Amino acid sequence: MHVSTLLVAVLLPLALSKPTPRKKTSSFKVHLARRGETEYYRDGPTDLQRAYAKYGIPTTHEMEGYHPQPISKLPGNSKATAGSGKEGVESQDEKGEVVNNPTDHDIQFLSPVTIGGQPFIMNFDTGSSDTWVMNTQMTDEEAKKDHHLYDPSKSKTASKLVDQNFDIKYGDKTHASGPVYSDVMDIGGATVRNQAIGLPSKVAASLAEDKTSDGLVGLAMTKLNTIRPVKQKTFFENLAEDLDEPVFTAQLRHGKMGSYEFGAIDKSKYHGDLIKVPVINENGFWEIPCSLYSVGKLDKIQTIQNGTGTAILDTGTTLLVLDEKIVKAYYAQVPGARYDPTRFAGWVYPCNSPMPSLFLAVGTDHMAIIPSSLLTFQSYGPGPDGVETCYGGLQSNNAGGIQILGDVFFKALFVVFDQRGPSISLAPHA
């Protein structure tokens, strides 16, 4: 098979609410400052367990015995803060942009959001369609600690949506549920006046323990929205008709500041040409064909055999979660790699082992390279044998029938989400 090297750096082609009317003449870049003097992180097995829960993937017997680690304090300097929302504001034009901040190990890319004039740091999630925020009406006082809390009584623009409730479940254990309010929501200068926002009266402990984030902005399709009895549009869907282009882009880079941008595609943020891929949106996800892979070399392209054939682009998931066939083929090329069913309930390897790159199909005509440098999630230090152990950024979907292109994928590629079609487009980061 002849393979062009036109985009060899990362992409390789193979043979219901109303948004605020806005002028399309200005935008704002919002730089993050610090969020206090504490910093938090998750561990790899916990993130994998949460990914399984989010998509209802059955856990392994070993994972059922693995207890998610509480969010732990670490020394360091990659901290996020919710300030006034105006710090470091830089006026530009014809687009709305918000700069995100990676937390430890790039587990989340967090961004400043203003709701009813109140500032928060939130996680943008292209794998769900509900927007919800920690708030003063939560019944669990412990869950409120160390979060910025939305108070509808302090907003002049808030109104409760009568008899409307949301209940988003990420598997059996992780959830958020409660009443729904409408309020003005601003992200990087892009504003929706009557955005539906869930105010959970209770949240799962794993969500409350994540002190880096005050909530979630869902950016998948309305079909996934859990508000009842009437589904509500996402922030992006409300905003799209007032944008120059109905798009938003994700620039999530390893260990660096990145950005989400609404209404325009900044050509300075990527190399080469964008590769456009139609989205399979029947399930409400940003889902694309993904049925080919190769480990290390493009001359050994293999077809995924178990019939999954698609993958979901999800900024709310940390890891790359793929069919077990791919994962086993990858780690077969990593000296000392093994599936550890006890301590890690996932794939680990000596940190000094050479790692191959991973090639994945994006659509039917192109392959994306995930560089080896992005495929280590974190180190756990020396094991009993004195060898430093690393947890892989690539993990198995446990035959769950769903493949998830999480932040490991986004760190390799600049991604455009386009409502027209819909479609996604990809290119190497600049």
UniProtKB/Swiss-Prot annotation:
Flavoprotein found in the keyword field: no
The entry's keywords: Aspartyl protease, Glycoprotein, Hydrolase, Protease, Secreted, Signal, Virulence, Zymogen
Name the record gives this protein: Probable aspartic-type endopeptidase TRV_06366
PROSITE patterns associated with the record: ASP_PROTEASE, PEPTIDASE_A1
InterPro entries, sorted: Aspartic_peptidase_A1, Aspartic_peptidase_AS, Aspergillopepsin-like_cat_dom, PEPTIDASE_A1, Peptidase_aspartic_dom_sf
Entry keyword DNA damage: no
Entry EC no(s): 3.4.23.-
Active site, UniProt feature: 125, 314
Location(s) in or outside the cell: Secreted
Function: Probable secreted aspartic-type endopeptidase which contributes to virulence.
Family under the similarity heading: Belongs to the peptidase A1 family.
Segments of skewed composition (Basic and acidic residues): 87-104
Domain Peptidase A1 stretches: 109-427
Glycosylation site list: 306
GO molecular function: aspartic-type endopeptidase activity
Ranges for region Disordered: 61-104
Segment forming the signal sequence: 1-17
Propeptide stretches in the record: 18-87
One Gene Ontology term from the biological process aspect of the record: proteolysis
A Pfam family this chain is assigned to: Asp
Source species of the chain: Trichophyton verrucosum (strain HKI 0517)
One GO CC term, this protein: extracellular region
